[in-house]
């Protein structure tokens, strides 16, 4: 599908990290002495290890720098490391893999798409852009209902649960990030369409701000709150403040100015009272005053 699953267990066979870690005896058994020595130099493997006496393989520098340091031809080093990794990968494939949670969550896929799009733009990597673009198209196809609203998640191809504000906010940010790579109008049009949807379903038309759940949610909804605090992920209202500014800069839609102003006003007292709980919202406010601060 080209989308991202939600989670993987850390342990397998009752041991945390077992699938991913390596012991020195194991590496010595699998590799020739020269290959093992080269692996140790490139990945800084020692007796102490870096995870409970064993090692999570972590390349210490880019291969070009390592080739210079070791006095080796760059192409030769790349080939050697590729062969070593293929050997270790084949052996690891025989291990019991951690359980994979195959739910596809709109919010989290939006975050991954945005990350790949940003990397594509900054690193000039076409392959990263293709990954992001394909995932975005898949999400829009699989997680968009007939009425245009979003589903929050899917499992085994079956979509369910009406999207939350965070799903819209992160996917909208992803579409904007994709537009920024090549200025393809398709992504900006998709972003503007999603913006219209989130304004219709989540925007408090009386007091401003975005509700966590759609106002037309099916099923009982006794209280519909507005959340501004960042937790493990960014709050939907903070993300939307950034999105509104980004859309204004790219589309010139003047109505966005009013939404931005009201979004800041409605949460000003809450953020002033407890600023440390809403750093991303404050970053958005700073961007209004000082310009884009995303790279700070």
Task: Enumerate the language-model features and the residues they cover.
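Glycan-recognition and catalytic cores of secretory/periplasmic carbohydrate-active enzymes
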Residues: 1-296
């Amino acid at each position: 599908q080209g989308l991202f699953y939600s989670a993987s267990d850390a342990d397998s066979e009752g041991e945390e990290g077992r699938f991913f870690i390596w012991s020195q005896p194991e590496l010595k058994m699998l590799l020739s002495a020269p290959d093992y020595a080269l692996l140790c130099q490139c990945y800084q493997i020692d007796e102490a290890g870096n995870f409970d006496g064993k090692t999570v393989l972590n390349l210490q520098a880019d291969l070009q720098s390592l080739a210079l340091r070791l006095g080796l031809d760059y192409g030769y080093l790349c080939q050697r490391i590729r062969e070593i990794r293929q050997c270790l990968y084949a052996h690891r494939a025989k291990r019991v893999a951690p359980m994979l949670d195959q739910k596809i969550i709109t919010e989290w896929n939006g975050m991954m798409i945005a990350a790949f799009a940003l990397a594509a733009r900054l690193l000039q990597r076409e392959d990263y852009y293709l990954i992001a673009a394909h995932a975005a198209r898949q999400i829009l196809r699989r997680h968009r209902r007939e009425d245009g609203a979003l589903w929050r998640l899917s499992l085994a191809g079956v979509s369910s649960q009406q999207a939350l504000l965070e799903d819209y906010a992160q996917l909208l940010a992803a579409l904007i990030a994709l537009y920024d790579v090549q200025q393809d109008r398709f992504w900006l049009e998709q972003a503007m369409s999603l913006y219209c949807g989130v304004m219709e379903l989540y925007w408090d038309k009386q007091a401003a701000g975005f509700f966590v759940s759609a106002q037309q949610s099916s099923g009982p909804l006794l209280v519909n709150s507005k959340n501004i605090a960042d937790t493990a992920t960014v709050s939907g209202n903070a993300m939307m403040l950034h999105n509104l500014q980004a859309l204004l800069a790219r589309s010139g839609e003047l109505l966005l100015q009013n939404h931005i102003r009201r979004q800041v006003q409605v949460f000003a007292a809450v953020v002033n009272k407890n600023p440390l709980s809403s750093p991303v919202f404050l970053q958005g406010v700073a961007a209004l005053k000082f310009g884009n601060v995303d790279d700070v």
